[in-house]
Amino acid sequence: MQKVIVVTGLSGAGKSTVSKALEDLGYVVVDNVPVDLLHNLLELYEAKNQEQLVAVVVDSRSLRHQGEVSKFVADLKDLKNRMPLDVIFLEASTDTLLSRFNLTRHLHPLVHATGSRIALIEAIEREKELMSELRDVSDVVLDTTGMKERDLVYQVENFIGKDRGPEFYLISFSYQRGLPTNADMIYDARVFQNPYYVDELRTLTGLDDSVAEYVRADHNYGRFLDLWVELAERSYNEHIKMGKPYLVIGVGCTGGQHRSVLVVRDLSDQLTKNGHKVITWHRELGSVN
């Protein structure tokens, strides 16, 4: 087969959106695959069509116990040695998942998993614990908290694109709204002077030149940026040695509007100049580049 994508993660985190995106990219998508049949299914497609793009969705509907998850992880490692296979793991904050389930009125797959009905929040937390082993071996972990559907599609398209995948994911965020759960490292942009307290800059963002000029005028800005670029590249090199193909860096400030956005912007420019492929996501602004 040309390529296999395994889509997994938490219920309500966006697997349906990713499945539709993969179909649009020419993948045959098989949903809710029984894990015991995964080997046979992929072997069938491999024998039938060497050029077929295949995506399978596997989640807690078919992984109900820790033993099943552990066996599935072992199966994935075996399959990776035999065919080109990547695992995409989707997650979101508990509050986000609660909101999505309450909006759609769908029943969480673990609500009845123990034979008796449990609260939705308990089902979500149980699933996070259950799927943690699978999360740890995934090729990419996408946190869809606050992410619009088109932004998720964009990130998936970039990950599975024909060119090499991104080496850095840079996320600007507000500390008031929580840290991005998939970040490998956090940079704190609150050390710089805050444009929020300048009336003519308050409603602007770190994408505006006037805000950039103000923040860059901080005597610490250039030194911190140079150090952060060096740290990012050194950390990425160590991640590569551990078999991890990319590094996720979160950059936070108070509101996620000014300083963190600019730092992500400048980090991206410098890392790109240094030959790296970078994806940026300004979480509080709802934009991906």
Curated annotation (Swiss-Prot):
Residues at which ATP binds: G9, L10, S11, G12, A13, G14, K15, S16
GO MF terms, alphabetically ordered: ATP binding; GTP binding
Alphabetically ordered keywords of this record: ATP-binding, GTP-binding, Nucleotide-binding
InterPro entries: P-loop_NTPase, RapZ-like, RapZ-like_N, RapZ_C
SUPFAM superfamilies: P-loop containing nucleoside triphosphate hydrolases
Origin superkingdom: Bacteria
Coiled-coil ranges (or none): none
Sequence positions that bind GTP: D59, S60, R61, S62
Similarity section: Belongs to the RapZ-like family.
Function: Displays ATPase and GTPase activities.
NCBIfam families in the cross-refs: PRK05416.1
Name of the featured protein: Nucleotide-binding protein COPRO5265_0725
